[in-house]
Amino acid sequence: MMLAQVNSIAFRLFGIPVYWYAIIIVSGIALAVWLSSREAVRVGLKEDDVFDFMLWGLPAAIVGARLYYVAFQWQDYVDNPIEIFFTRNGGLAIYGGLIGGGLALFFFTRHRFISTWTFLDIAAPSVILAQAIGRWGNFMNHEAYGPATTRQFLENLHLPTFIIDNMNINGTYHQPTFLYESVWNVLGFIVLVLLRKKPHFLKEGEVFLGYIIWYSFGRFFIEGLRMDSLYAFSNIRVSQLLSLVMFVAAIVIVIVRRRNPNLKFYNREKQKKKITTS
């Protein structure tokens, strides 16, 4: 039976291939920026604060994501380092993007005299939703898949036929780990938004820390299924190690910060008053 494999190239512009991976990633980023800008206005910041940050944050995130990937796949680039600059076929690591974007955000908020924790809280739900969307770029690139399985297993998950067909990689069916993470991230987005709206529940900074806890917990287990993991040394998967560290660190930070009686709740009206009068 011939399977209808998706084409990773969406179209060609003046002979230059434009990949679905890039289109999906950009779409996720655009949605994240729009959602973050709306939340920024609700807590007393300006839309331009979000848009201006993207001038810093997006390049930093892309560079961080690429350097992170290349650092652990150096053997693929050592003989032809010019390939480091070619990202249309993938090769971006989410954790590297978070590190690069996080550093840019720290310096940006300091430069603008904006609370770093507030900005992180604004962005966190949008970021995890963008990650959920971005995983479909992996699907279009036929990457980020799991161990070998059977078509019957995939059918038992009640997946659409186009997903099942495209989990056939080189004649072998694989588990759709991209989909597992995408669904996990969508659930995380819903949880974070609901908790963020709940008055007097989350303290400032805890939306972001909740994102770290949720994402790293799911990523730890999903990463264990992936066939294309980056390895630090021996059989230690980089993303699993980093997920474990971030999960524990985020919980510890929440506990320590909760001991501060002056720590404010993430409350839009109070936060708006505080920001606009400072």
UniProtKB/Swiss-Prot annotation:
Mostly located where?
membrane
What is the annotated signal peptide range for this record?
Answer: none
Q: Does the keyword Membrane apply?
A: yes
Example GO BP? lipoprotein biosynthetic process
| Pathway assignment | Protein modification; lipoprotein biosynthesis (diacylglyceryl transfer)
- Identify one Gene Ontology CC term for this UniProt entry: plasma membrane
Asked if Oxidoreductase is a keyword of the record, the answer is no
Q: What class of enzyme is it?
A: transferase
Q: What GO MF annotations does this protein's record show?
A: phosphatidylglycerol-prolipoprotein diacylglyceryl transferase activity
Location comes to: Cell membrane
On the tree of life, the source organism's domain of life is Bacteria
Q: Which InterPro entries match?
A: Lgt
Keywords of this protein's UniProt record, alphabetized?
Cell membrane, Membrane, Transferase, Transmembrane, Transmembrane helix
Task: Cite the binding residues for a 1,2-diacyl-sn-glycero-3-phospho-(1'-sn-glycerol).
Answer: 135
- E.C. number: 2.5.1.145
Its record classes its membrane topology as:
Multi-pass membrane protein
Residue ranges of the TM segments: 13-33, 50-70, 89-109, 175-195, 205-225, 236-256
Pfam families recorded: LGT
The record describes the protein's role as:
Catalyzes the transfer of the diacylglyceryl group from phosphatidylglycerol to the sulfhydryl group of the N-terminal cysteine of a prolipoprotein, the first step in the formation of mature lipoproteins.
What family is this? Belongs to the Lgt family.
Question: How is this protein named in the record?
Answer: Phosphatidylglycerol--prolipoprotein diacylglyceryl transferase
The species this protein belongs to is: Enterococcus faecalis (strain ATCC 700802 / V583)
Gene encoding this chain?
A: lgt
